[in-house]
């Protein structure tokens, strides 16, 4: 068969499952199965292993119905993909709180600019966006990418809390946040 670009799975499948797939591919095709192998960390529930056999599973569709896709996506991306993630009421609440800290000034910028009849620009701050992308290129280092999102959120907050608002600057921070969040699949 053809070589595929990316093959992924849980890090618990690395040996023997994925190593067997590589061996089988070489035996049949004289080449490996994939250019890149990505092994994700495990998802724990309240500090313990989540498993169908243990009967302690949580369904994504139920979480999305209750909390929305942005919150679960934010939580899932809050750790590096290779690290273990603990799902609990506390971690979900933390994800909601963090997203709200970004959403509130973002929404204020939209509302206040409309009230001031000011148009927000679409220029993205290249320096902050590049720092965000550097983190993403560093083996999807989402914790560092999140730090850059919070830095831009802080700058947006500061630009809204002055007597004479510079709407072009506000627009730049909003556009930068939009572009960063779009990379993560989060849309306000």
Language model regions located:
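Alpha-helical recognition segments enriched in aromatics with Gly/Pro capping
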Residues: 1-110
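Feature 926 captures the class I aminoacyl-tRNA synthetase adenylation module centered on the KMSKS loop
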Residues: 28-31, 64-65, 81-188
């Amino acid at each position: 068969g053809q070589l595929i670009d990316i093959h992924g799975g849980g890090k618990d499948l690395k040996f023997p499952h994925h190593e067997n797939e590589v061996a089988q591919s070489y035996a049949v095709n004289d080449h490996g199965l994939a250019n890149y192998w990505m092994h994700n960390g495990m998802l724990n529930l309240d500090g313990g292993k989540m498993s169908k056999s243990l009967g302690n599973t949580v369904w994504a569709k139920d979480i999305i119905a209750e909390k929305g896709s942005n919150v679960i996506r934010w939580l899932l991306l809050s750790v590096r993909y290779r690290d273990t993630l603990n799902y609990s009421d506390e971690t979900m609440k933390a994800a909601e709180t963090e997203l709200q800290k970004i959403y509130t000034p973002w929404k204020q910028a939209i509302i206040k600019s409309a009230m001031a009849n000011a148009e927000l620009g679409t220029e993205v701050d290249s320096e902050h966006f590049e720092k965000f992308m550097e983190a993403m290129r560093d083996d999807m280092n989402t914790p560092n990418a999140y730090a850059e999102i919070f830095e831009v959120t802080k700058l947006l907050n500061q630009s809204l809390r002055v007597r004479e608002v510079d709407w072009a600057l506000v627009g730049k921070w909003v556009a930068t946040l939009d572009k960063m969040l779009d990379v993560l699949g989060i849309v306000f």
